[in-house]
Amino acid sequence: RETFNSISDKVKFFIIAIDGPSGVGKSTLSSLLADKLGGLYVDTGAMFRCLAWRWQQLDCPEDDDALRNLGLQTRIKMASNQIWCNSTEVTELIRSEQVSALSSQISKFPVIRDIMKQKQRELVEDVRNSGSFSGAVLEGRDIGTVIFPNADIKFFVDADPEIRAQRRFDQLRQKGEEVEFDIILQALKERDAKDRNRSVAPLVPADDAILVDTSKMGEQQVLNTMLQHIKMIK
């Protein structure tokens, strides 16, 4: 396996930030990239989904104190492609359309974003100090603009809404869920609008992010494109 340090020995511990809208394939690409480079894959979107799931379970009110307590009392662990939230394995539970919608909703609160920013930075620092990985590949909203603005390289992955909706439709059908394409497309467009227009940390590419449009590219082609950019780091 080619490690990041064999690509550029000038970076002792790399941080790669991958951002982009919902349903664009960030999770799969980030996981493949981390495996290829010997880094830890951190799905920050899943961290927000864990909060959204607990929010749903506890019926937590929408005030700062309650949300702060929710954030501080939520313990998230990622290991072996599984996600644990306060001792409950939630890998599949947090992938429902309902939790997805709640995740977008809860992420609009500044108090939640501040807590999650701290949790994400602490996670990466723990990984750095452990020496277990060559670096970290972080995927999710605001990674390159807010959480790690000094990341070694930033990607903003995008694709046409119709193509993203089709991918999501196929994914849910494979899981045996009864879904309608038009409903998924409408929900995706609504989430795009909310994410791009929200007042707190809107979805925008970092000024120095590399834009990757996956609309007409296969998975391996996208991965190779990203690796070529990484090899050019000086």
How would you describe each model-predicted region?
Residues 4-10, 85-91, 169-177, 194-234:
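NTP-dependent small-molecule kinase module
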Residues 16-18:
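Hydrophobic anchor at the beta1->P-loop junction of P-loop NTPases
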Residues 21:
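P-loop (Walker A) phosphate-binding loop of NTP-binding proteins
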Residues 26:
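Conserved lysine of the Walker
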Residues 29:
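Hydrophobic positions on the alpha1 helix immediately C-terminal to the Walker A/P-loop
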Residues 35-97:
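N-terminal phosphate/diphosphate-binding loop that engages ATP/GTP or pyrophosphate donors
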Residues 91-175:
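ATP-dependent NMP and nucleoside kinases share a basic, alpha-helical "lid"
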Residues 161-169, 181, 185, 189, ...:
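An amphipathic alpha-helix signature
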